[in-house]
Swiss-Prot record:
Protein name: Neuromedin-U
Record GO terms (molecular function): neuromedin U receptor binding; type 1 neuromedin U receptor binding; type 2 neuromedin U receptor binding
Species per Swiss-Prot/TrEMBL record: Mus musculus
Function: Stimulates muscle contractions of specific regions of the gastrointestinal tract.
Modified residues (Methionine sulfoxide): 141
Family per similarity comment: Belongs to the NmU family.
Cellular component aspect of the GO annotation: extracellular region; terminal bouton
Length: 174
């Protein structure tokens, strides 16, 4: 087969390289998009440490950002640009996921119960501000008892604990 038969007429060397790379890049793009969904993708027995994974994502993100910022490459294929855009979107998802994990961890910490020693007493871990609720209740009850035991209190005063039900505030409540 002659050399001229394998050469497309009217294409420069750069255009020929881009044209032959386009199907390969399309295949890479397809594999990158479907890698997590495929059951047959080999998984490394040694997973990356979180620091290594974060460093890898940062390097990929920087490489794609620099590639997309350079507009002087007209021979770069559309598929490669799309691949970089997808990688940049994926690199932002782990940060969002870690924020969700922190929120879940916070909520779990304040909703879980723990057993103390060998006793059967179960105490719940509460938010520090919620620990003030019993003190506020004690203050209210002391104020109510002081108001109720004063000599000027009439019979109708004990019917409402803190304020009338129609929403009007009494002068002694303020």
């Amino acid at each position: 087969m002659s050399r001229a038969a394998g050469h497309r007429p009217g294409l420069s060397a750069g255009q020929l390289a881009a044209a032959t790379a386009s199907p390969l890049l399309s295949l890479l793009l397809l594999l990158a998009c479907c890698a997590d969904a495929c059951k047959g993708v080999p998984i490394s027995p040694q997973r990356l440490q979180p620091e290594q994974e974060l460093q890898l994502w940062n390097e990929i993100h920087e490489a794609c950002a620099s590639f997309l910022s350079i507009d002087s490459r007209p021979q770069a294929s559309v598929a490669l640009r799309e691949l970089c855009r997808i990688v940049m979107e994926i690199s932002q998802k782990p940060q969002e996921q870690s924020e969700k994990d922190n929120t879940k961890r916070f909520l779990f910490h304040y909703s879980k119960t723990q057993k103390l020693g060998n006793s059967n007493v179960v105490s719940s871990v509460v938010h520090p501000l919620l620990q003030l609720v019993p003190q506020l209740h004690e203050r209210r009850m002391k104020r109510f008892k002081a108001e109720y035991q004063s000599p000027s209190v009439g019979q109708s005063k004990g019917y409402f604990l803190f304020r009338p039900r129609n929403g009007k505030r009494s002068t002694s409540f303020i």
